[in-house]
Structure formats: structure tokens, C-alpha cells
Amino acid sequence: GPSMPTMFDLVGERPQMVDVDGQGLIQPVDAKGIGVLSIGFFTDQDNAVVWRGPMASKALTQLFTDAHWGELDFLLVDLPPGTGDIHLSLVQTVPLDGVVIVSTPQEVALADARRGINMFQMDTLKVPVIGVVENMAWFTPAELPENKYYIFGRDGAKNLANGMNVPFLGSIPLVQSVCEAGDAGRPAVYQENTPTALAFDELVHTFVDELTKLKAKTL
């Protein structure tokens, strides 16, 4: 999304063009060893990106076909919620290993997550759902680090995953440090030995385990 330059502390950076076998390709911007490409690099930070579905889909496709990603461990694509043109274009353009569904616990958000799972599992798409992540699962104030307040309900995404027979990957708490880290361009995972960093670390390990099992089934 267009906010990625801010979240990776890359505001003002611009991807460079590189020559690869006689073809000019976009070189992703490096952020501590992570290659990043975003529409936000090509638009003014304060201007709205008002594109119809086909134009947005074309732009997404170009971030794959016109970029020099090189050797990667993982290529992650952050998509907006919904079941529209962008999602279909991605499925039709890129051979995906799977998708991760992220939802907050309340029913109004779970309804979108449920539709997303159903879309990717359609016979015409058949994209594996690696699992579900519950974001903003609980609130923990800094002065009461042992307390959990379930502002948006409890275990909504976990129950959704169990009910739809897909893996549950983990929960991310609602804490001020995540907001501050995103605004400052310092990912929360860099906060050593904090509940937030530990939650992300556990989530990543579970994600890799589930993806490994999923790929083993297709061999």
C-alpha cells in the first residue's frame, strides 16, 4: 500500500532502474535487507490515489513483472480488504503459495475475512489459505502489562479459523508501541523482549511452519 514508505522509514526514497539482460527493471528499495516496492514511491505522499479497478490491477501487476526482485526467501504482498479486481488480478498473474487472512475480532471485520477465505477457496481460484491472524486482539496498557482488555471481542478470528478449518497463526495485541513504530518507520519486531515483538516472532514461526507443511503436501 501507499503507506509502506512511511512504515519502513523510506519517505523520499525512489526506486532506481537497473539493466537486467538488456531489459530495464525497477530495483526495489532496500530496508534493512528487505526489498520494498509500493505505489507510495511513485505518488505524492499527501495526494489520494484514485484509481479504478483495472488501473490498480495493472499497477500491482507491474510491481511483479517490471521489477528485479532477485533471489528471495519470501515475497509478501499486502492487499486491501475485500474481494475485488486487485485480488483476482494477483491470483491470475502470480503463482501464489498461499494467502494469510488478517482480521480484527469483531463480527463486522470477520464478515470480510470470511468472504475472503471463501473467495480464495473457490474452485476457479483454489489458492491455499495458510492461516488467519487476529490483529488488535487485546489492549494492554503500559502501566498494567499483565492485563488484557478485549475491546473488540475475544477470539473472533481464532473461532473463525477453527470454524472454517484453516490454521490459526496467532494474535497481535493493540499496543501504543506498534502505532509509534509504524509512524517512525521502525518495525515493532525490533523491540527486543517486548510482548509485541514476542507475538510477532511467534506468528512468523507459526507462519513458516504452516507454509512448509502446505508446500510438502503439494510435492
Indicate residue ranges for each PLM-predicted region.
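Phosphate-binding loop that captures ATP/GTP phosphates
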Residues: G1-D46, S57
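Signal for well-folded cores of large energy- and translation-related assemblies
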Residues: P5-G12, T61-H68, V91, P95, ...
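Short, hinge-like loop/turn segments at secondary-structure boundaries
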Residues: D9-Q16, I117-F120, E146-F152, P187-Y190
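Loop/turn-to-beta-strand initiation segments
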Residues: K32-G35, G70-L75, G98
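Phosphate-binding/switch loop-helix module in NTP-utilizing enzymes
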Residues: G40-L90
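Conserved catalytic-core segment of NTP-binding enzymes
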Residues: D73-F74, P80-E180
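C-terminal boundary of histidine-terminating zinc-finger modules
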Residues: G182-T196
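Histidine-centered active-site loop/cap adjacent to the catalytic His
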Residues: N193-K215
